[in-house]
């Protein structure tokens, strides 16, 4: 059985989950810190001949770590710095996502050529298909959901209603619980929660440092990148990388 869920249905489902919480044994939580491990298959990500000289079976899987800090209204998904990754560091993206559920808004910091790009926009509205498939991730029972981004791209997510905020890695949200697993259909990029701590985040962790930088909307940024780099041979690759999850 597969169930379709949109933004309008989500509040009812989350509300129902929270109601159950008060009659349960206290297993539902709306705050915490989740450490994620991301595995990227570099052979699937880079298929041109130049990159094949740098990537082989021994180093094709690149591992990055992230953390998701959250309470009942706000969250931040951010990379955990690894000073040992050396020259392979540029091969994968490491972005920051701040989400504010009450305001239905998000602030994103994208990394591009060693510089940061700042984006403020509304929370994405995705149509999820919830399936009957289940698995346990880091001690939490999860259910599988599918998002069809376009005709050629499907994203799989595993969420748990035991953590009630509808958030997840890379700004993915909109399910009746927190996403603990996220993957592209071909397995080229996979996120899984490795540890979950029930600790409340600090307010300063949930507030981005905007400085005096220019802030774009997603529509404005896409238009600028297409205009500036759309005619270059590497422009499409950069565009796909930046907006893979958006």
Map each language-model feature to its residues.
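Extended soluble regions of mature proteins
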Residues: 27-246
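Bacterial Sec-dependent N-terminal signal peptides
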Residues: 1-34, 244-246
């Amino acid at each position: 059985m597969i169930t379709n869920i949109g933004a309008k249905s989500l509040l009812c489902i989350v509300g129902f989950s929270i109601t159950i919480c008060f009659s349960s044994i206290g297993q539902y939580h709306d705050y915490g810190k989740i450490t994620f491990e991301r595995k990227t298959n570099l052979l699937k990500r880079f298929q041109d001949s130049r990159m094949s000289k740098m990537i082989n079976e021994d180093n094709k899987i690149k591992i990055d770590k992230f953390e998701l800090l959250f309470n009942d209204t706000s969250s931040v998904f951010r990379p955990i710095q690894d000073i040992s990754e050396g020259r392979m560091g540029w091969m994968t993206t490491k972005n920051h996502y701040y989400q504010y559920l009450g305001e239905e808004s998000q602030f994103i910091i994208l990394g591009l050529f060693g510089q940061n790009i700042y984006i403020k926009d509304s929370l994405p509205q995705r149509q999820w298909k919830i399936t009957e498939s289940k698995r346990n991730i880091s001690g939490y029972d999860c259910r599988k959901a599918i998002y069809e981004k376009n005709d050629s791209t499907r994203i799989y997510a595993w969420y748990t209603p035991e953590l009630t905020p509808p958030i997840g890695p890379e700004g993915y949200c909109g399910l009746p619980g927190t996403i603990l697993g996220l993957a592209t259909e071909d397995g080229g990029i996979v996120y899984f929660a490795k540890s979950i701590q029930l600790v409340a985040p600090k307010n300063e962790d949930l507030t981005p440092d905007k400085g005096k930088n220019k802030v774009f909307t997603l529509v404005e940024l896409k238009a600028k990148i297409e205009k500036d780099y759309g005619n270059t041979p590497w422009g499409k690759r950069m565009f796909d990388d930046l907006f893979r999850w958006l």
